[in-house]
Amino acid sequence: YKGSQIFAFDFGGSIRAAALGMGGDWQDLGGALHAEEGDSAAVALQPLARIDNAGERAWAAEWLAAMLAGEGMVIDPAAKEHLWSALTSLASAPPAERTLTGLAVLLQSQELKQALAPYLICGPWGRLLDAEQERLGEASVQAFETEGLIGASSAAAVLAYLFHRIEGRLDGSPTMIIIDEGW
């Protein structure tokens, strides 16, 4: 109903028709990994776009640390300092340059750069996570197809970012979050 919002995480496309029928957006997260370059319909995420805000920068530092730990990196105080320094420098760049590739250029640790490589535009997950401009629906009904994402090493990073974005949209209006066939 008017003023409410729905976020649905789907597996197998069972919510697609309902979401589109309600005037919502349906995003195929796994399909974005295999989309052709320049496909304007594919989901494209820019997790570092808002790091000029100190709270967003702190969130990004934690998100990156978790993502890199998933790649086998030991995130010690030195690694955290490298991440924070690069994020702080990147925060002053124009929004279109606040990408994971932009972060990699500024990182002073070769090990962190190597661990970040799969998430850069030239890596297997870059088409989804290293956009210069975010393409993610803004409708009050959002459905995210996760089937093609399940099993991918990027799944945790993608879902953590999406839940962070959803958290930013929680404004007191009635909200439903659906996790269909969750794991």
Language-model segments: residues:
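Short, polar loop motifs at secondary-structure junctions
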Residues: F11-I15
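P-loop NTPase motor domains
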Residues: R16-D25, L29, L33-W183
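P-loop NTPase nucleotide-binding module
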Residues: Y1-F9, L159-R165
